[in-house]
């Protein structure tokens, strides 16, 4: 479906549903990402990736705004800050205990996602937990700056979402997504599978010096969002396509204004155009974390990390594409093995029917 949608993005798409509400969501995503990136660049914040990715995630995954959404988003970030201080500050001297606590938190959050009503709380918690554990594990990281940046970015995301939903409201009320009925065995399967694989990713990033592979880390975590093997396979294909699209666009932008990339007035319109294209693809797909969402988050991560005009751009893009591909292959292998293992037991059995 996403490949067909990708082809229709460049052509008349009479057989693709793109409503007035979809157009407004596209505009909200592009404007929010551009504003967030402008703020993080203007103030030269150390963890600009938070300021860019959080608004993009919130408005891409949740097309509405209300108090329930705001509470879940802010509460998740606040709880994560407290958890990270306790885990890294007090448990880092006991690696086994630390890993078990991280595993328990991942399982709890994926269980929230699997059950449905607290999906945003769980998904935001998974992303926060993964990125903050990665950043805080390196001695050069300033914990206070990291935690304040995380909370400030969260508040900024909620404020931008509220403002843009007020200024660019939907034309008609949106229908809530259909509720998926899941039995207890399926919920256990999804939460244990995703939690175990996420914990293994955490251990690998702790053992190896992978501080510059945030894109690869997020790729491995985000394809776990379907929380079952078949969904992870499809999600990984979408992820690779989205990352390649975004990297090619970023390369073109950097080549066009190579010596002037520090001029916001030149960069921001092109970044906004890339976000608008990716957001349009995302809302046309209507599959959640598809090609468009992968492209949106890749643009946010790469520009949020402040790409510099004098680095090797071709190597930078190829490095990210290669690292993401390797991360996805390894993650899919782990998902497959866990899927087979959990299906050996009736209490955690989950067979996807055709």
Which residue ranges define each predicted feature?
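Alpha-helical transmembrane segments and their membrane-interface boundaries
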Residues: 1-121, 135-271, 277-354
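Conserved catalytic neighborhood of penicillin-recognizing serine enzymes
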Residues: 131
């Amino acid at each position: 479906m996403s490949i067909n949608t990708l082809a229709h993005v460049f052509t008349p798409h009479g057989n693709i549903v793109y409503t007035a509400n979809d157009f407004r969501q596209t505009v909200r995503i592009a404007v929010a990402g551009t504003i967030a990136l402008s703020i993080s660049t203007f103030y030269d914040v150390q963890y600009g990736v938070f300021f860019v990715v959080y608004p993009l995630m919130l408005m891409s995954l949740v097309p509405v705004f209300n108090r329930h959404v705001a509470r879940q988003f802010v509460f998740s970030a606040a709880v994560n800050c407290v958890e990270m201080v306790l885990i890294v500050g007090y448990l880092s001297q006991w690696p086994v205990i630390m890993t078990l606590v991280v595993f328990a938190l991942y399982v709890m959050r994926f269980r929230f996602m699997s059950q449905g009503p607290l999906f945003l709380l769980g998904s935001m918690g998974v992303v926060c937990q993964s990125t903050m554990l990665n950043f805080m594990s390196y001695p050069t990281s300033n914990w206070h700056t990291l935690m304040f940046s995380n909370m400030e970015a969260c508040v900024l995301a909620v404020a931008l979402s509220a403002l843009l939903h007020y200024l660019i409201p939907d034309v008609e009320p949106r229908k809530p997504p259909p509720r998926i009925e899941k039995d207890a065995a399926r919920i256990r399967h999804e939460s244990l599978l995703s939690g175990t694989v996420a914990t293994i990713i955490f251990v690998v990033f702790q053992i190896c010096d992978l501080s510059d592979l945030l894109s690869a880390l997020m790729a491995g975590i985000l394809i776990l969002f379907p929380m079952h093997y078949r969904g992870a396979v499809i999600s990984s294909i979408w992820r690779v396509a989205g990352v390649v699209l975004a990297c090619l666009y970023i390369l073109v932008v950097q080549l066009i204004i190579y010596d002037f990339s520090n001029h916001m007035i030149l960069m921001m319109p092109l970044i906004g155009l890339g976000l608008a294209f990716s957001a349009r693809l995302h809302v046309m797909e209507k599959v959640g974390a598809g090609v468009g969402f992968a492209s949106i988050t890749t643009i946010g991560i790469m520009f949020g990390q402040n790409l510099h005009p004098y680095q090797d751009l071709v190597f930078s893009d190829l490095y990210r594409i290669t690292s993401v591909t390797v991360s996805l292959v390894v993650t899919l292998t782990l998902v497959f093995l866990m899927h087979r293992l959990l299906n050996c037991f009736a209490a955690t059995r989950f067979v996807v029917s055709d």
